[in-house]
Amino acid sequence: MTTFYTVVSWLVILGYWVLIAGVTLRILMKRRAVPSAMAWLLIIYILPMVGIIAYLSVGELHLGKRRAERARAMWPSTAKWLNDLKACKHIFAQENSSVASSLFKLCERRQGIAGVKGNQLQLLTDSDDVMQALIRDIQLARHNIEMVFYIWQPGGMADQVAESLMAAARRGIHCRLMLDSAGSVAFFRSPWAAMMRNAGIEVVEALKVNLMRVFLRRMDLRQHRKMVMIDNYIAYTGSMNMVDPRFFKQDAGVGQWVDLMARMEGPVATAMGIVYSCDWEIETGKRILPPPPDVNIMPFEQASGHTIHTIASGPGFPEDLIHQALLTATYAAREYLIMTTPYFVPSDDLLHAICTAAQRGVDVSIILPRKNDSLLVGWASRAFFSELLAAGVKIYQFEGGLLHTKSVLVDGELSLVGTVNLDMRSLWLNFEITLVIDDTGFGADLAAVQDDYISRSRLLDARLWVKRPLWQRITERLFYFFSPLL
């Protein structure tokens, strides 16, 4: 019997080390950033079983077999649609400003189409204004409405949007609604999902959370886009989820969420429509390619129209393009660079680009919320402050609530607005969208919004920062080491 237990013990020990060696080899063979690989290896060797389970669950980008097959299957039709769209030469911009030229060339070469011109844009900074404008557009819709949100939280004006959407479906408008399973869990547990389906709305629960399939697909891969398209002509996107800030996370102790949305009219709605159609097909298997822009309803094809490139991440879209876009925009800055984000855990490349911009004389400002709803990200963000301050970057801590806006402004002319946080999840993992806008008028509007944020912020004093307690420094460094995994 003793021999039996000895053999079993040795087999368990052997299996244990074979498993660790196998996972280690897999991490080393994967093409990933060195800090990320080192962080995973540290977890696995300090807490082997916890680390192995965590890595197999969320360490690799598993979309799931069915979705991966759909992503491959949709590409031929999507490629044909893009080629057909190129025939609409009147919607594409031929020239860009000097500060935007490199970024627009990057987007065109990687995505296959140029930026679209002739768009009208309106920045909306108040949640009531956003929802009232959205309700008005829904009421005037004539053909179709498509929506996707990470979070839909019932309550307040969000319920009024839901009522208007159901009314549109009842009068024959084709309505589609896609919501992230994890982010919108409160919605799917409420009566609203059934009510909408009964009204004729196609409601899809994207990337369903299923613990039984935790090793087959990443559960933390989330649909983070926020988009609305109406009649293939009107579009919305930005940082705002479908929530009323007066009812959302009131017990988090961070104040009301502060967001930014862009309302657009023009061919950009078609560019955003193909993003939505790809997401819809991956999730449902149904193909809903949008029609080309209607030249008869494009009154803004003049020099006054804004030129926009739409960048999306996720299956079917160029890998790493959003990260490349941020790097290109940062290196293009000559006068000033203002970044606004709720979560700041940059890649080494992006951190280096930001610091280098400041060191070559660019006036660089980063606006972050002073209070954050994510304890882990909040501490990890602080770990980068010393290097940023030493390079001459100004860090503003917003005190008027949880600043949730995601925006970048370069030299008053090149703007990036969308759903992308400056953290690893947005840069490498989630389904995101950002607009790249080449226009001084829009840049002035965004600058006014950012100036308002700065007026409600406190500038971080580098002299006081270096005097913070030792325990804070230790905590920051601990979270910094694991920041590639956040």
From Swiss-Prot:
- PROSITE patterns membership: PLD (PS50035)
User: Does Nuclease appear among the keywords?
Assistant: no
| Top-rank EC class of the record's enzyme | transferase
Q: Which residues form the active site?
A: H224, K226, D231, H404, K406, D411
Where's the PLD phosphodiesterase domain? 219-246, 399-426
Tell me the keywords, alphabetical order. Cell inner membrane, Cell membrane, Lipid biosynthesis, Lipid metabolism, Membrane, Phospholipid biosynthesis, Phospholipid metabolism, Repeat, Transferase, Transmembrane, Transmembrane helix
Which superkingdom? Bacteria
List the EC numbers from the record.
Answer: 2.7.8.-
Bilayer topology: Multi-pass membrane protein
Gene Ontology biological process terms, A to Z = cardiolipin biosynthetic process
Q: What is its main location?
A: membrane
**Listed GO molecular functions?**
cardiolipin synthase activity
Protein function: Catalyzes the reversible phosphatidyl group transfer from one phosphatidylglycerol molecule to another to form cardiolipin (CL) (diphosphatidylglycerol) and glycerol.
Per the record, the similarity remark reads: Belongs to the phospholipase D family. Cardiolipin synthase subfamily. ClsA sub-subfamily.
Output the NCBIfam families linked to this UniProt entry.
bac_cardiolipin (TIGR04265)
From the Swiss-Prot or TrEMBL record, give the protein name: Cardiolipin synthase A
Organism lineage: Bacteria, Pseudomonadati, Pseudomonadota, Gammaproteobacteria, Enterobacterales
